Amino acid sequence: SPIKECADNPANKMVEHRLHFSYCFGVQAVILEVDEETGKVQILRVYAANDVGKAVNPSLVEGQIEGGVAMGIGYALSEKFEMKDGYVLTKEMKDMGLPHTTDVPLDIRTIIVEETHPFGPFGAKGVGELPLNATALAILNAIYQATGVRVKHLPITPDKLKAMLAERK
């Protein structure tokens, strides 16, 4: 299949049905604390390693990774966008549960991996929202490591986590 062909050849050659000129790879790890009485999750540190090809402007790449981490934290812990029967129920930004600056740790350790790409501009691959999904999944795995509770639905709000912790006992 075209998708399998692209996945099997992520960087070394162009293929006819390529979905994108390059694929980016990243991995995140999260250190957190869980208050089992309230279900509140406090993110203490995030490690974010991302292969961006050539980092043309490393400071901007670092900022992009930090922004993706913040988005991933919101995605995992608080953000919601509700619809019913094709109608938007979450009508205002204030109701979406976007993370506040206090929800994002000061300790985000970005690791820029530079594996240049022959077809990217100046060897770049891109970074975009690459850290978003990896951060959310790293948070869920860290919650599992801390509590033994496997979260399968997002966002994992304090009330939802508190209920899952109570079921565990």
Q: Where do the model's predicted regions map?
A:
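C-terminal catalytic domains of large/alpha subunits in multi-subunit enzymes
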Residues: 1-169
